Amino acid sequence: MLLRMSNLFLRTLREDPADAEVPSHKLLVRGGFVRRTAPGVYSWLPLGKIVLENVAAVVREEMNRIGAQEVLLPALLPREYYEATGRWTEYGDTLFRLKDRKGADYLLGPTHEELFTLLVKGEYTSYKDYPVILYQIQEKFRDEARPRAGILRGREFHMKDSYSFDLDDEGLQRSYEAHRQAYIRIFDRLGLEYVIVKATSGAMGGSASEEFLAIAPTGEDTFVRSTGSDYAANVEAVVTPAPPERPIDGLPEARVHHTPNTPTIESLVEFLNNAGLGRTFTAADTLKNVMVKTRAPGEKEWELLGIGVPGDREVDMKRLEASLAPAEVALLDEEDFAKHPFLVRGYIGPGALQANKVRYLVDPRVVTGTAWVTGADKADHHVVDLVCGRDFTPDGTIEAAEVRDGDPAPDGKGTLYTARGIEIGHVFQLGRKYTDAFSLDALGPDGKPVRITMGSYGIGVSRVVAAIVEQSHDERGIIWPREVAPADVHVVGTGKGDQVEVALRISQELVDRGVRVLVDDRKGVSPGVKFTDAELLGVPTVLIVGRGLANGVVELRDRASGDRSEVSVDTVVDTIVNLVRG
């Protein structure tokens, strides 16, 4: 492959785009790899398309290695298949929905579990046909409310989605592990620093689920690791260790106190510590009750839900939404409070919730025998020593409180610390959610039907491109790993004398030896501009054909390390070939 910048469809930019927030967005646009078409929608230009296809090639190789077979299904999908599994409503506003001229409903596919299940159902009938793994690399669509960060969170994106079909759970476990190992090889080859974390399944359904997160401070996903073990989990999947229950006998009676002007935890704690109650109070002694409303998929009516968490914790809406998925969750508005006058803002307690049959879920730390300070359901009043299991009984527990550095690890080994990452892969053991919906059976060896079990596995191919840039760049530009770079070597002819002609000759010799070359043969462009573009574009090896040519030498630069060396023009082709081939 020989790309000549004199006729390459490429314009580099010196300034960051106005809407760019993260390095990958800035550099991919400045380098002419992508261009914004609409919010969350990007066009891939020649160099970007090459990088995208290089990532896809690595994914294909490793998927084929585990025996997966590539297919291509439509992106335009009929409503009825997604209605059969409930995802037409579960996905809510994130689905792109449309009608054809006859009024039939369609969607643009976010994932393809339904279609793959029906595809296999239409082709396979016997146990002898299984197991099978199918995959595709295709554009997906999600109507993100706030598309941001360039191609990191877009409305249209490239994704590899694969699906395994097995006769039993043991087979599913083997397929799941095969994918897990394939993903490890893929991300290792791509040079990414990543972590594998426990995750929730959300609208996908199923049981076991893990995410592959590229470690980056700009990532949208918060995950935790343990100081004492290899435990790692997405913050949404962290399970709070519950303390042991405590005896109730002998605990002080609950008493209501007049606590004027104390609608916040801070003001309440300050008041109590100056009220002469004979002990010191902290925010952790209080029980904060947060009101939300939930709505099941397809339902019109909202239901009230009370969430009780220790007062020194905030409610993490992502954790709350994950715990209640697939239901929709929203905070109460003025109209809601007006409709339910028993909800006294700033002073809500379990009493009014239970008296009015409002479901009440609490943090796992709220166990029988624990005493709390909480709202007395009356303005300017709180109750002290309200004991769980004696004075109130919650309807259950929920993971909704924020996770903090220093929290005990769920496995009992060490404490947690948080970091941020970019989700680049996700693997699910779906089980039989989709095969039940479409009655996907195989005729077993005994002549009886066997319900097939499924796995679902995704890699965000376009997001991987951005994740690589997030991890591999400097103040001058991108630093591509050789496996995905748009070229193996960037040859720069500085433009004086016969330097461009020699650069073109060396480039052709390299191409003849199987090296991918990007050559800057532009005339009328200063050496400084060419060097700046070479650093911005990030090809791992840069060859400068410049002033040293008069002495029979050229300069090799390593984009990552910055190392430079002079090489004889007569041996430079062999040197580069050996470098590229490792």
UniProtKB/Swiss-Prot annotation:
- Name of this protein: Proline--tRNA ligase
Q: Which domain of life is it from?
A: Bacteria
What does this protein do, in the record's words?
A: Catalyzes the attachment of proline to tRNA(Pro) in a two-step reaction: proline is first activated by ATP to form Pro-AMP and then transferred to the acceptor end of tRNA(Pro). As ProRS can inadvertently accommodate and process non-cognate amino acids such as alanine and cysteine, to avoid such errors it has two additional distinct editing activities against alanine. One activity is designated as 'pretransfer' editing and involves the tRNA(Pro)-independent hydrolysis of activated Ala-AMP.
Query: What gene does this protein come from?
Result: proS
Similarity comment: family membership: Belongs to the class-II aminoacyl-tRNA synthetase family. ProS type 1 subfamily.
For the protein in the UniProt heading, the enzyme class is ligase
Q: Which organism is it from?
A: Thermobifida fusca (strain YX)
HAMAP family with a match to the protein in the record: Pro_tRNA_synth_type1 (MF_01569)
Q: Which reaction does it catalyse?
A: tRNA(Pro) + L-proline + ATP = L-prolyl-tRNA(Pro) + AMP + diphosphate
